[in-house]
């Protein structure tokens, strides 16, 4: 496949994959100064477009929305999103020629046509920004030489960009400057100010590259962030019901359980999440996680290989050209699963109960996080970037499941993420279904270890040491020290 990444030499590919630097808070001391009094035009007003714009306006910036003429005339949802929040709205021709910063926040599938439409209207020496580098890296789009091209990529769905900002926090963010388009050397300063305006500096900002962002983002969302949560939801629900758990209770345990379980992950990593289990349950979750890792590792490696080579992007773009046949088929299959169609009980479930009766879910999270992290690092992605794409974003995705199950998760993630999630889930379920069904009923929906709380001390010590010594735990402990304003999701 011919694209920007594949046009690079191997040395340059590795260099860009390995670009990742955690930025210190004092690097954002200028706050939004370089963007003050600048005309900022966001193209598209979906989940990312609206919520980033709301944060930036609250940070004192001048935000307008450029939409297709048809979207304005027909008063489509993007027009409603912008006008109902009192933003100035206009066509490409009306707003983009005046813009100092143009931010393309349309769906990935539309980027090529959108850039073709707006680039002639972008004034000389302006700045163009993306929140995902797919169009540059995978499609190979070339931008006019006088235009500075940057990326500010919040590592979560757009809805959570806003929710975390309103909590007084933010979401981890990757920023980058396209090396082919920084004619005046201003890209990094503009990207820093933009990240500050969305609140990203409070959660941690990585100076990355377009290549590293795209390859790690695709891997994280396909495997742990969306794929494992979808596969785990469907298989765990089916197992619980087969084992006699009341379906409405099972639905609630899963729908809200991911959010609760990964809240512990967010604040203290895998170690803290596993520590919420009883000692017997911890040992059993460890055994299940190790077995899941062994069974799923080849699939994780295939996804990473296909992402690096461009095979994944080629397949997805073929589906785009085929009117999203695969995506729509998989979406319909997901909507018709028993988990999606079963209403959650109104019965209260206490926080600790989600852990006590969710040993299998904890094991899925541990296996998915560690596998995604390990596979990305093996491919040359720096540990800090792999951490954000495997562990830290997981509770933010889990929060979307808590709202409206898998439907909500797949609705608010990007179109590339949704396709990748279904692709992974379609292959993962047959890999682990029989193993999951063979597990004892106590690992899902019933409290584990009620007969005996005794464990082998040496075995417990060994498991605890293994958990704490995993590289994702070490890098996570370091990065979380910067997240001093981190807020609870689960209340």
Swiss-Prot record:
Substrate binds at residue 414. It comes from Christiangramia forsetii (strain DSM 17595 / CGMCC 1.15422 / KT0803). Pathway: Amino-acid biosynthesis; L-isoleucine biosynthesis; L-isoleucine from 2-oxobutanoate: step 2/4; Amino-acid biosynthesis; L-valine biosynthesis; L-valine from pyruvate: step 2/4. Its cofactor is Mg(2+). Mg(2+) 1 binds at residues 217, 221. Binds 2 magnesium ions per subunit. Involved in the biosynthesis of branched-chain amino acids (BCAA). Catalyzes an alkyl-migration followed by a ketol-acid reduction of (S)-2-acetolactate (S2AL) to yield (R)-2,3-dihydroxy-isovalerate. In the isomerase reaction, S2AL is rearranged via a Mg-dependent methyl migration to produce 3-hydroxy-3-methyl-2-ketobutyrate (HMKB). In the reductase reaction, this 2-ketoacid undergoes a metal-dependent reduction by NADPH to yield (R)-2,3-dihydroxy-isovalerate. The active site is at residue 132. Residues 15-208 form the KARI N-terminal Rossmann domain. NADP(+) binds at residues 45-48, 68, 76, 78, 108-110, 158. One of its GO terms (biological process) is isoleucine biosynthetic process. One of its GO terms (cellular component) is cytosol. Its EC number is 1.1.1.86. Pfam families: KARI_C, KARI_N. Belongs to the ketol-acid reductoisomerase family. It catalyses: (2R)-2,3-dihydroxy-3-methylbutanoate + NADP(+) = (2S)-2-acetolactate + NADPH + H(+); (2R,3R)-2,3-dihydroxy-3-methylpentanoate + NADP(+) = (S)-2-ethyl-2-hydroxy-3-oxobutanoate + NADPH + H(+). It is an enzyme of class 1 (oxidoreductase). Residues 209-353, 354-486 form the KARI C-terminal knotted domain. This is Ketol-acid reductoisomerase (NADP(+)). One of its GO terms (molecular function) is magnesium ion binding. The gene is ilvC. The lineage of its organism: Bacteria, Pseudomonadati, Bacteroidota, Flavobacteriia, Flavobacteriales. Keywords: Amino-acid biosynthesis, Branched-chain amino acid biosynthesis, Magnesium, Metal-binding, NADP, Oxidoreductase, Repeat. InterPro entries: 6-PGluconate_DH-like_C_sf (IPR008927), 6PGD_dom2 (IPR013328), KARI (IPR013023), KARI_C (IPR000506), KARI_N (IPR013116), NAD(P)-bd_dom_sf (IPR036291). Mg(2+) 2 binds at residues 217, 389, 393.
């Amino acid at each position: 496949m011919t694209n920007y990444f594949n046009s690079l030499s191997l040395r340059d590919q590795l260099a860009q994959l390995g670009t990742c630097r955690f930025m210190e808070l004092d690097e954002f001391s200028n706050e939004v100064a370089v963007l003050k009094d600048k005309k900022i035009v966001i193209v598209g007003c979906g989940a990312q477009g609206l919520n980033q714009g709301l944060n930036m306006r609250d940070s004192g910036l001048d935000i307008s929305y450029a939409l297709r003429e048809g979207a304005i005339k027909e008063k489509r949802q993007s027009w409603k999103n912008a006008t109902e929040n009192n933003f100035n709205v206009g066509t490409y021709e009306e707003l983009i020629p005046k813009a100092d910063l143009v931010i393309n926040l349309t769906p990935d599938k539309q980027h090529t046509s959108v850039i073709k439409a707006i680039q002639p209207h972008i004034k000389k020496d302006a700045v163009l920004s993306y929140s995902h580098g797919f169009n540059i890296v995978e499609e190979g789009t070339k931008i006019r030489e006088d235009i500075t091209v940057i990326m500010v990529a919040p590592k979560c769905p757009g809805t959570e960009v806003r929710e975390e900002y309103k909590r007084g926090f933010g979401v981890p963010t990757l920023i980058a400057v396209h090396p082919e388009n920084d004619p005046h050397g201003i890209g990094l300063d503009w990207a820093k100010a933009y990240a500050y305006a969305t609140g990203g500096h409070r959660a941690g900002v990585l100076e990355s590259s377009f290549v590293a962002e795209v390859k790690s983002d695709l891997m994280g969302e396909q495997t742990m962030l969306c794929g494992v949560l979808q596969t785990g939801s469907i298989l765990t629900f089916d197992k619980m019901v087969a084992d006699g758990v009341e379906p409405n209770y099972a639905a609630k345990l899963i729908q809200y359980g991911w959010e609760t379980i990964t809240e512990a992950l967010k604040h203290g990593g895998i170690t803290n999440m596993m520590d919420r289990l009883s000692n017997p349950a911890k040992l059993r979750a460890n055994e299940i996680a190790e077995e899941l890792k062994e069974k799923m590792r080849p699939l994780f490696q295939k996804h990473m290989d296909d992402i690096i080579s461009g095979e994944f992007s080629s397949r997805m773009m073929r589906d785009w050209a085929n009117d999203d046949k695969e995506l729509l088929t998989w979406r319909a299959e997901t909507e018709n699963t028993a988990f999606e169609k079963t209403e959650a009980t109104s019965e209260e479930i206490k926080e600790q109960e989600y852990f006590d009766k969710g040993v299998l879910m904890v094991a899925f999270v541990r296996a998915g996080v560690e596998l995604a992290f390990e596979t990305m690092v093996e491919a040359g992605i720096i540990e800090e970037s792999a951490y954000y794409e495997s562990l830290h974003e997981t509770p933010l995705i889990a929060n979307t499941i808590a709202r409206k199950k898998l439907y909500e998760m797949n609705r608010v993630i990007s179109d590339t993420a949704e396709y990748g999630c279904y692709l992974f889930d379609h292959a993962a379920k047959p890999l682990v279904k029989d193993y999951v069904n063979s597990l004892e009923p106590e690992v899902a929906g019933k409290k584990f270890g009620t007969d005996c709380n005794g464990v082998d001390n040496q075995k417990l010590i060994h498991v605890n040491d293994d958990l704490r010594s995993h590289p994702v735990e070490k890098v996570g402990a370091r990065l979380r020290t910067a997240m001093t304003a981190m807020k609870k999701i689960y209340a």
